[in-house]
Structures are given as C-alpha cells and as structure tokens.
Design a protein with these regions (language model features):
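Predominantly a Rossmann-like dinucleotide-binding segment in NAD(P)-dependent oxidoreductases
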Residues: 29, 155-237, 241-245, 361
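N-terminal Rossmann-like dinucleotide-binding module
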Residues: 21-76
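Rossmann-fold dehydrogenase core element
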Residues: 136-154, 174-176
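Bacterial N-terminal signal peptides that target proteins for export
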Residues: 1-11
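Beta-loop-alpha module in the N-terminal Rossmann-like domain of NAD(P)-dependent dehydrogenases
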Residues: 67, 77-140
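Bacterial N-terminal signal peptides
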Residues: 9-20
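C-terminal helix-rich "cap/oligomerization" subdomain common to oxidoreductases
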Residues: 97-99, 325-367
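Contiguous beta-strand/loop segments that form the cofactor/metal-binding neighborhood of enzyme cores
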Residues: 220-295, 321-330, 353
C-alpha cells in the first residue's frame, strides 16, 4: 500500500470516527427532561421537538389546575406525567434536567426545588426578576453543583456567532459602540395567549415590562461582546406609550450602559411596527450589522459587503442539543457563554440598575 493510499485511508478513518462520535453525542440515550410550568409562550419550543429523539419528557409540573389540563403538551404525553406539585414530580420521575416555562418570579422556586436534588435547570430568559433572586439562585446552583443555564432565542443565531468570530479576529478593530434592537408590536398586539400575558404584563411576576422582556437580549449580548470589561454605569428611560394596554409596566425601554472602552445602547420595545432582533457593532476599523439570524453586513477597508453567516454545528445550534451536551458533560459552559450563569448574573444586574435608574432619573453606578 503506497503512502497516498495510507493517507487517504487515515483521513477516511478520522472522518468516520468524528461523525460517529458526533452522532453518538446527539443521539445516545435521550435526556430525561421535565417541564416546570406551561404558561410561557415559548412552550412551543418543546412541543415542536418532541419527536426528535434527543430528549424524553418524563414529567410536567403545573400548579394551575386549568392550565395543567389545557396546554399544548397535554394531548401529546401520557396524562399520568402531569403533576400539580413540582417536588412530587421531581421525586417520582427523576429527571436529569428541568426546563422552566414559569413566570420569571418563579424561577427561584424551581431552582430551590431542583438544586438540593442535584437536577440541572434551564430557564427562559432572563435568569431572574432581580438581583436578590439571581444571587440566591446562583448560590444554590454553585453549592449543589448543578448547571443553571438561561435560554435566549438569539443565542442560536448564526450571525451573532460569526460577529463574535470576526471581532475576536480584529476585523473591525476595537469596539467603541454597540446598539441592540429587540422588540415587536406588543404581547397583546401579536396575540400572545392569556396564560402568558397575565404574568408577562405584571411588574412582580415578570419583574417589569419591555425592559425585562426585551432589554435582557442586549444585556446578554453586550456582556459577551465586552468580555472582561465590567459595566461602569447604567442610565435608562422606561416609557408607557400604551398605558391603556399596559397600565402596570413599561412598554418601551432605552438602556445606556457605559463601559471603560465603549457605550452600549439597548433598545427593547413593545411599540415597534414590526418584530426585530438585530444589532449594530461599531469598531475603529469597521462595523458589523447583524440583521437577521442568517444575514449580516460587514464594513471593512472602506467597503460594505453582505454575507450569509455559516451555520452553527450541533450542539451549539439548538438549546435542547446544548442542554443535553452540557448535562452529559460532552461540552463545557465557560463563563463567557451566552447561556452561562456568570453572563446572566450580569444581565440581571444591568436590568435591575436600569429599573432603578428609570425610577430615580439618575445614573446608577455599578463598578
């Protein structure tokens, strides 16, 4: 056998081994997954993946009698998997991880139940309603050595990760400004379910309005982009443009976060004429416009070009693949990760400061 045949054989063997290991990581034994709460509008993310095979729902806990009987999972799972009490469900079904579709205020309650049992948790964004809750959740997670992850839609955008890569390579130079835009026409306007809006528009159960619902995206991305820099201060304006629809909470938020080397402006709104989740990043050598999950514009060397961002590889392209891989210790979750506890503690700190700033009409110093 000549050297070329040997080389070709070794390359084929390496490729086969890689594909086999990748398939094993994604397939393997399904993750034993439980669901806490069914009132969140993002419950469809579970429903749409039920038949995929990477996880198995072993239990659903919902304290509201009506919602426990009337939800999108009810006709797809064995009725015996539904429980009124979270603790009972955890003790009888022994999940590896719990995904949370409760009001944000109840994230703490779920972690208080899961952490002592050694069960990992993934919540929908943001991590918590305030610093007090977030600190307690983090303490429990660290003490009991569980993963406490936060899921954002934008974490799985190809364009965001391509932006990170370009910035890390120095393509646009030193970042000096980031503008983040997240929002839509409003929860009522886009016909969110009543079970969702009942708490989404409640200042206690959700922690706020648009500032929490959409301000968290920008805080999450900015924390990742600014890496080791800590925010110096936060100034925010929270408005009620539609008090007849949202009398208890803000429906439009502008948050200015000052870093030692950059200014970040986070705009979250329930008042825009369309839905959007995009970001403009400016450096001293160029800019990146993250326009959609797949499309972006990049300005370097005096020219703008449009690009389709490369697709993300599993498990980094899907929240459930990611959760399974993290729980099974197939991947690490570094502090810089968008889903990490460290990142999301900072997110809550920024949002908490934004609410304080709007109330006091003053700049809130952080570090």
């Amino acid at each position: 056998m000549n050297i070329h045949k040997i080389t070709r054989y070794l390359l084929m063997l390496c490729a086969f081994t890689f594909l086999t290991l990748t398939a094993k990581g994604q397939d393997g034994e399904p993750l034993r997954l439980a669901v806490a709460g069914v009132s969140h509008g993002h419950l469809w993310e579970v429903i749409s993946r039920l038949d995929r095979g990477d996880f198995k729902i072993v239990g659903v806990a919902e304290k509201d009698d009506y919602l426990r009987e009337h939800n999108g999972l009810r006709d797809k799972l064995d009725p015996n998997l539904f429980y009124a009490d979270l603790g009972e469900m955890l003790d009888k079904t022994h999940p590896e991880a719990v995904i949370v579709y409760e009001p944000i205020y109840d994230h703490l309650r779920v972690v208080e139940a899961c952490a002592p049992r050694g069960i990992h948790v993934m919540v929908e964004k943001p991590l918590a309603v305030n610093n007090e809750h977030a600190t307690r959740m983090a303490s429990l997670a660290r003490e009991k050595n569980i993963l406490l992850l936060t899921n954002y839609e934008t974490t799985w955008y190809n364009t965001n990760h391509e932006a990170f890569r370009l910035i890390d390579s120095g393509a646009i130079g030193k970042i000096d400004r980031i503008n983040v835009y997240d929002g839509h026409q409003g929860p009522f306007e886009i016909n969110c379910g009543k079970e969702f809006t009942d708490w989404l528009t409640d200042p206690v159960r959700n922690g706020g309005g648009a500032v929490i619902d959409f301000g968290c995206y920008g805080a999450n991305l900015a924390t990742r982009l600014m890496k080791d820099e800590k925010p110096l201060s936060v100034y925010a304006v929270l408005r009620q443009n539609k008090p007849n629809l949202y009398p208890k909470v803000d429906d439009d938020a502008t948050i200015i976060v000052e870093y030692p080397s950059a200014t970040v402006q986070i705009m979250g709104s329930w008042c825009w004429p369309m839905g959007r989740k995009d970001m403009h990043i400016y450096g001293d050598k160029g800019y990146i416009y993250q326009d959609t999950p797949k499309e972006m514009r990049i300005y370097t060397n005096g020219k703008e070009r449009q690009e389709i961002a490369p697709s993300l590889n599993a498990p980094y392209n899907d929240s459930f693949y990611f959760l399974k891989a993290a729980v099974r210790k197939e991947i690490d979750v570094p502090p810089t990760d968008l889903s990490s506890l460290e990142n999301n503690l900072m997110v809550v700190r920024i949002l908490d400061a934004a609410i304080q700033s709007a109330k006091s009409k003053a700049v809130i110093q952080l570090f």
